[in-house]
């Protein structure tokens, strides 16, 4: 039987696996993912299916835009997953397979997959959707992103909003709970994007001031 790790133990493992400084703007993301993944790993009803994998990889990619150095991003995800008992490469593969399986399906076809879901008879479907999986905000984002892949055209955002909420009950979750987590995700993403823009502006201003100081100190000027 696998030993259950505490959040503190998971964080200690993370720092061993990722011996670098996490920039301040990304620390909250790392902490929250470690806590949530640690809790999910200890839930008997939880399955790391395609919807979960899509949600986790999407959250990580969305919230680490602008992360520097770029070559540490993969190591960061691996460390977050490893310290909580998951495999980053495995989840990325599951997410890829789930996206391929869902590609081209409309909302009604996805509903049929959920309704007909049976692990023994449809293993490939089970990897995409595990109905009544233990709920988490990561799965909420996975549902949202799954539907977003099917939406297109000028009203893509509106179509996604309507369709993902229509799909929620089929997963066995309440609309209010999922909508709250998706809205929080969007709000948090907007805040971090603005924070990154501000950081970039400050960096440019500092470079400009340094250049001006160097120019003023040159002989004959």
UniProtKB/Swiss-Prot annotation:
Keywords: Coiled coil
GO biological processes: photosystem II assembly
Keyword Coiled coil: yes
InterPro entries: Thf1
Coiled coil: 174-213
Keyword Flavoprotein attached: no
Stored Pfam families: ThylakoidFormat (PF11264)
GO terms under cellular component: plasma membrane-derived thylakoid photosystem II
Cited NCBIfam families: PS_II_psb29 (TIGR03060)
Family, per entry: Belongs to the THF1 family.
Role description: May be involved in photosynthetic membrane biogenesis.
Stated name of the protein: Protein Thf1
Gene that encodes the chain: thf1
């Amino acid at each position: 039987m696998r030993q259950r790790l505490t959040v503190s133990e998971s964080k200690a493992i993370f720092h061993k696996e990722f011996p670098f400084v996490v920039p301040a703007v990304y620390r909250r993301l790392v902490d929250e993912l470690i806590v949530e993944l640690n809790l999910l790993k200890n839930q008997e009803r939880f399955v790391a299916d395609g919807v979960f994998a899509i949600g986790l990889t999407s959250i990580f990619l969305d919230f680490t835009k602008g992360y520097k150095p770029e070559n540490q991003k993969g190591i960061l995800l691996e460390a977050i997953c490893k310290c909580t008992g998951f495999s980053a490469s495995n989840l990325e593969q599951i997410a890829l397979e789930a996206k391929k399986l869902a590609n081209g399906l409309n909302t009604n076809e996805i509903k049929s997959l959920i309704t007909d879901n049976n692990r023994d008879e449809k293993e490939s479907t089970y990897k995409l959707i595990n109905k009544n999986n233990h709920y988490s905000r990561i799965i909420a984002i996975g549902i949202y992103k799954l539907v977003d892949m099917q939406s297109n055209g000028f009203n893509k955002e509106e179509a996604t909003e309507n369709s993902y909420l229509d799909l929620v009950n089929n997963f066995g979750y309440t609309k209010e709970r999922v909508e709250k987590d998706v809205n929080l995700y969007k709000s948090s993403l907007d805040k971090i994007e603005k924070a990154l823009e501000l950081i970039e502006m400050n960096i440019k201003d500092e470079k400009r001031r340094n250049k001006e100081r160097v120019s003023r100190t040159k002989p004959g000027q």
